[in-house]
Design a protein with these regions (language model features):
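Short, flexible catalytic-loop segment of classical short-chain dehydrogenase/reductase
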Residues: 21, 42-53
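A conserved structural motif in NAD(P)-dependent oxidoreductases
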Residues: 68-79
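Alpha-helical segment proximal to the catalytic Tyr-Lys
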Residues: 29-33, 92
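Active-site "substrate specificity/gating" loop of NAD(P)-dependent dehydrogenases
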Residues: 4-10, 32
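Conserved catalytic loop/helix region of short-chain dehydrogenase/reductase
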Residues: 8-12, 26, 50
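Active-site helix of classical SDR
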Residues: 16, 24
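Short C-terminal tail/terminal secondary-structure segment
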Residues: 5, 84, 95-107
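Conserved SDR Rossmann-fold cofactor-binding beta-strand/turn motif
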Residues: 37-47, 87, 100-102
Length: 107
């Protein structure tokens, strides 16, 4: 989501996310004739060690996750399940997409 909703102090990070999405869309067009599909997964906050190193207290982290409509951070399994779908035949006609995985958060 950083590519769409940049924040103060994150210009390079946000620009890099936008570049990755653009690159993936270009690759999708270039590789489609060979039946190679390229998509992006754009997750919001996923509960990993990185969150724990972010400097927030446990109480602040618990409060922050309540801002998501689903009232929790994403889990690594949430990303893995979407990746498995994208790899499956069920997504055979999907390429060039940037898929938000945000627990309902719009920003």
């Amino acid at each position: 989501k950083a590519a769409e909703y940049p924040s103060v102090g994150n210009a390079i990070y946000s620009a890099s996310k936008g570049a990755i999405i653009s690159y993936a869309k270009c690759l999708a067009v270039e590789l489609a004739p060979r039946q190679i599909r390229v998509n992006c997964i754009c997750p919001a906050m996923i509960w990993t060690e990185l969150i724990l190193q972010g400097g927030l207290t446990k109480e602040e982290m618990e409060e922050a996750q309540l801002r998501y409509p689903l009232k929790r951070y994403g889990q690594p399994e949430d990303v893995a399940n979407l990746a498995l779908y994208l790899l499956s035949d069920a997504a055979a006609w999907m390429t060039g997409s940037a898929i938000d995985l945000t627990g309902g958060a719009q920003q």
